[in-house]
Regions:
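Extracellular loop and loop/strand-boundary signature of outer-membrane beta-barrel proteins
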Residues: 33-34, 86-89, 157-163, 209-217, ...
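Residues that define the transmembrane beta-barrel architecture of outer-membrane proteins
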Residues: 42-44, 95-99, 165-171, 189, ...
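Short glycine/proline- and aromatic-enriched beta-strand/turn motifs that initiate or cap beta-hairpins
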Residues: 25-105, 271-287, 294
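Predominantly the C-terminal beta-signal and adjacent terminal strand-loop region
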Residues: 59-61, 67-68, 229, 233-294
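Gram-negative (and chloroplast) outer-membrane scaffold detector with strong preference
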Residues: 40-42, 102-207, 275-280
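Bacterial Sec-dependent N-terminal signal peptides
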Residues: 1-33, 294
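Flexible, solvent-exposed coil segments and beta strand-coil junctions
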Residues: 76-84, 148-157, 204-210, 252-257
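Outer-membrane beta-barrel translocator domains and adjoining extracellular loop/strand segments
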Residues: 58-64, 126-132, 203-212, 253-259, ...
Length: 294
């Protein structure tokens, strides 16, 4: 599995930044300890946003009753929905693009635990040249029947169509740390970094030998990730996030034609996200109210 220079560089940045960020939060390196910490302990927050994604090349293994073969160094891309206010801002269509949502809780003023979904879309590029190893029996395909060993072959739609377009669903929990960069009146700019671990529940759209696949949701594997970004509080309660996430996905149980026919792959990913969120000091207000009314 080859990893592009772009993905290698950004993953290295996220890895280093994530280790340094807790130190930044205390102000040791950026000397921001003189700034008063925002009272975020017990604060609840939620956000919704959209993403673009890039993927490393991957080897994809297909197994079934009459075939067992691997395609090597498959290139893939995301499938971004062209911007339209009607699609991106209408409640019944906001689920069509590549989206993200998370809900979190501040354990203290600088540490947040959250859970959420990254809905990416993964499309193996058609008509690319690849290599194949393994076997395909004539019961599966007369056209492609044979034994292969690193044999060049074209990745055409009548051979294999391989997509996670509804989608590449990464459900994860993340632990993030925050550090102050700037504050004026009610506005504030923070940076954050974190670690995530979760599972993949794709709805894979796969056709083999010109036969339509099952196209069902299925728990296919696991993933892990690092995230870093900026949070800008515009007014109390309302904020925007800009962030980059990089990670590794391993799916060893992808349903293709039916639950007896499977695929497996592993790859690195990068994701750029923009989101709008709302935070609520519900527990703090409740605690203060109980103190004022003993």
């Amino acid at each position: 599995m080859r990893v592009s220079f772009k993905i290698q560089s950004l993953l290295l940045f996220l890895f280093v930044f994530s280790f340094l960020q807790p130190l930044y939060s205390e102000g040791d390196l950026l000397k921001i300890s003189c700034l008063k910490s925002t009272e975020r302990k017990k604060q609840i927050w939620i956000y919704w946003g959209y993403n673009r994604a890039q993927y490393s090349k991957s080897n994809i293994n297909f197994t079934g009753p009459n075939y067992d073969f691997t395609l090597f160094d498959i290139c893939a891309k995301d499938r971004a929905t062209p911007f339209s206010a009607r699609v991106y801002f209408t409640p019944n269509t906001i689920w069509i693009p590549q989206y993200n949502y998370r809900i979190g809780y501040f354990l203290n003023d600088w540490l947040s635990l959250n859970i959420g979904l990254d809905h990416m879309k993964y499309v193996a590029v058609t008509d690319q040249m690849t290599k194949i190893s393994g076997r395909i029996d004539s019961l599966s395909s007369l056209q492609y029947a044979g034994n292969y060993e690193q044999t060049p072959i074209e990745f055409t739609s009548d051979f294999v169509r391989f997509e996670h377009t509804d989608g590449l669903n990464y459900v994860s929990a993340e632990l993030e740390t925050y550090g102050r960069l700037w504050k004026k009146n009610k506005q504030e700019l923070d940076f954050f970094a974190g670690y995530g671990l979760g599972v993949l529940i794709p709805r894979s759209d796969v056709d083999l030998f010109d036969h339509e696949g099952a196209n069902i949701f299925h728990l296919a594997g696991w993933g892990t990730s690092l995230v870093a970004g900026l949070r800008f509080d515009i007014i109390p309660g309302l904020f925007v996030n800009m962030s980059v996430k990089g990670g590794f996905i391993h799916m060893a149980d992808i349903v293709t034609m039916n639950k007896q026919e499977k695929a497996k792959q592993k790859f690195f990913f990068l994701q750029e996200m923009a989101s709008v969120g709302y935070s609520l000091n519900y527990f703090n207000k409740k605690e203060k109210a109980s103190q004022n009314n003993p």
